[in-house]
Amino acid sequence: MTENIKDALSYAVELAGKENKIICSKTGKEYFDGNEYSLQELNPRKYTPILELQTIKSLVDYLKSDNDLISNRKLIVVVNSFQEISVYDQVDFENGKRPQLVSVRASVPVIPFSNWRDQEEFNIMLQSMFIDDADRNLVLDFASHLKIEKGTEVQDNGISQMATVRDGVASLAQAKTPNPVTLRPYRTFNEVEQPASQFIFRINKSASLALFEADGGKWKLEAVENIARYL
């Protein structure tokens, strides 16, 4: 019993030594001293929630509207990537922060590059996720007429492939895959021009088809430039 009382007294003394205190800074801010090593501001400045948008037009409309009385503030618009834009307020030097006001993220389809798709899925992907232009139609035409049956081989020299395609109503013919092809998928904001880039078009023995990106990501820089030019 005596040892328990002694332990309780020791704990009480320890708590007294770490008594919570309110500390006032030179700027008048009050901080809570929880453990002598970490100060927590009692009434920190509250920032408005980040406004989330999906189009560049909505961002431009917001900035022009002056709904939040921002016309006289020095804002910074940052094109983070081909799918994201951020707007920051001027620096809050007192709190050491640059508050973010707006976040804009493009709503674009997820295109399964480098993944094998059957002919139907591949054709749907081309028609729904790519801009209608010459090379898209060339690939679409080839994919639509592709025919691989038992005993048929896809000839491949590492650059192009030869496959059997329907030629007319009943006859079949050998045709070379179009490669490389220049396509414009929907990958950035709809308000700006979709960058064109090169792709490798491939077929496997099961007649599945795939597109592989072949421009090293150069299109991303072009997309960022297009967004900045629009703004």
Where are these regions (language model features)?
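An N-terminally focused, membrane-permeabilizing/fusogenic/translocator signature enriched
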Residues: 1-86
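Alpha-helix boundary/N-cap detector
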Residues: 3, 50-54, 113-117, 121, ...
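Generic detector of well-ordered alpha-helical segments enriched in charged/polar residues
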Residues: 6, 57-60, 120-127, 140, ...
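Generic secondary-structure transition motif, activating predominantly at the C-termini of alpha-helices
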Residues: 13-17, 64-67, 130, 134, ...
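N-terminal start-of-chain detector that recognizes signal peptides
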Residues: 46-49, 153-158, 169-174
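Long, mid-chain structured domain cores
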Residues: 60-133
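Amphipathic, membrane-inserting segments
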Residues: 65-70, 78-80, 87-96, 162-231
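Membrane-inserting effector segments that mediate pore formation, membrane fusion
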Residues: 111-162
